[in-house]
């Protein structure tokens, strides 16, 4: 998994908390990354209808989705987050051995199921929930 999911949640909480438009520079400063990375990730959120952009003096990103109903699953889907992924596969499907030829398929199913479990868990957590946790921590 890359950091896009974390960055997206951080940006959405900032936008929710501020209640106004924020530039990619302002978001990047709070997230501790560069504005180009923010713009790249927020492009996915814009495409999903979660944020909008404005140019000009009051320009920047503005939250358009209701943070109380915007689930982390929706955010994950907007940035194409995969929580469990493995690019390398052991074995060889062309070998005459059940273990060697079957392991990649079994592991792919395992990873897919784990991603589905993560998505189901995240569907119960909203941007407002994260914001509330941040401001009620002791």
Regions found by a protein language model. Give the residues of each.
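N-terminal helix-turn-helix DNA-binding core of bacterial DNA-binding proteins
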Residues: 1-33, 62
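Short, structured loop/turn "capping" segments at alpha-beta junctions
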Residues: 21-23, 52, 128
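Key DNA-contact positions within bacterial/archaeal DNA-binding proteins
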Residues: 36
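Basic amphipathic alpha-helical segments that dock to polyanions
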Residues: 41-46
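Residue cluster at the C-terminal edge of the helix-turn-helix DNA-binding motif
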Residues: 47-50, 78
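Beta-hairpin "wing" of winged helix-turn-helix
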Residues: 49-64
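Non-DNA-binding regulatory cores of transcription-related proteins
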Residues: 64-138
């Amino acid at each position: 998994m890359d950091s896009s999911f974390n960055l997206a949640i951080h940006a959405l909480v900032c936008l929710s908390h501020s209640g106004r438009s924020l530039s990619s520079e302002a978001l990047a400063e709070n997230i501790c990354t560069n504005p180009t990375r923010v713009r790249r990730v927020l492009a996915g959120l814009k495409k999903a209808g979660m944020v909008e952009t404005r140019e000009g003096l009051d320009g920047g990103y503005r939250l358009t989705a209701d943070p109380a109903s915007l689930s982390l699953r929706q955010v994950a889907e907007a940035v194409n987050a995969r929580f469990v992924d493995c690019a390398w596969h052991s074995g060889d499907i062309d070998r005459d051995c059940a273990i060697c030829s079957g392991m990649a398929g079994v592991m792919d199913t395992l990873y897919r199921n784990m991603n589905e479990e993560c998505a189901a868990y995240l569907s119960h957590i909203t941007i407002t929930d994260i914001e509330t946790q941040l401001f009620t921590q002791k």
